Curated annotation (Swiss-Prot):
Residues annotated to bind ATP: K15, H206, I207, G208, N209, G210, D283, M284, R285, G331, M332, G333, E334, N335
Catalysed conversion reaction: acetate + ATP = acetyl phosphate + ADP
Quaternary state and interactors: Homodimer.
Binding, substrate: R89
Organism: Streptococcus pyogenes serotype M12 (strain MGAS2096)
Ribonucleoprotein as UniProt keyword: no
Subcellular localization(s) per the UniProt record: Cytoplasm
GO cellular component: cytoplasm
Name of the featured protein: Acetate kinase
Amino acid sequence: MSKTIAINAGSSSLKWQLYQMPEEEVLAQGIIERIGLKDSISTVKYDGKKEEQILDIHDHTEAVKILLNDLIHFGIIAAYDEITGVGHRVVAGGELFKESVVVNDKVLEQIEELSVLAPLHNPGAAAGIRAFRDILPDITSVCVFDTSFHTSMAKHTYLYPIPQKYYTDYKVRKYGAHGTSHKYVAQEAAKMLGRPLEELKLITAHIGNGVSITANYHGKSVDTSMGFTPLAGPMMGTRSGDIDPAIIPYLIEQDPELKDAADVVNMLNKKSGLSGVSGISSDMRDIEAGLQEDNPDAVLAYNIFIDRIKKCIGQYFAVLNGADALVFTAGMGENAPLMRQDVIGGLTWFGMDIDPEKNVFGYRGDISTPESKVKVLVISTDEELCIARDVERLKNTK
């Protein structure tokens, strides 16, 4: 019996979940937000209770100390040594990491070097890893990479149609992201369908603030929508998704506020997508409220969002030469029935049909009609559990 913490650290946040392993029982979960800012918020949920504190938390090391002290203070653990492993979500593993690994100094250095592939994510993950290693140096730390699942893509899929020297010299290629989520929901879909994963062709749609769609052939990723960075693919909450790359130098020439490529990429990452087009929010709930009010910018943002997702799903039907099921997961994928309805409404030619009585908020499972040739599933993702499982598997290999 051991306890494992799954960590998802961002630049100013640290989301966590504590498991009793190998039973896979969730003992507590929480999030520390606004790290490095005034009025940081630490939230802990356990035994049906919710504790919230407003603090000044200056960095990730301080955040980890507060998290561990809270676990003792609220009686969730009696001592630090009850924790035998920590698993960290890392977005970009590049070509270096094809599977989860135990952290050492070299691994941490490589994660920091790979920040160029995920500038919004890897630096925060590295800070979280460093903090846990400083405070709990004797326990096993494991990195679980979003990109690992996509290392099964063929070369003709992951290479861009540019001179090959940019791949050879600079490793410019498609890496993908959200791999842990795509892997988990594909496994769960196979259970739900009562068929071996090795026989299935699945399209998995992770639709949250970040959006990625993956073509899964017999349990392996054969294509995915995110690319060299998580900026590629369909429209997202604050990210543009795919655009004509010639727009970048054009905007630098035209807009004095955009001084260089970094400014444009920052705009595409943080000020675009649903938020940028609507001028309202990156949250689909706010966009849907705008639809009810006939707000033209909300309508436009919503229509672009649906259009881009439909196109991406459609191309993966071609990649797989048909599919057995389409899986919706993540925040919007699980909780936005209107979005699911409108996406499927544009894909009926592929043989999909959903039951409106099942396509409602809170429902999980098969939402397709009995006649639907392609099953439509809503499955809650559980990246934290995948991380905890990998820690359990690797903690004795240090």
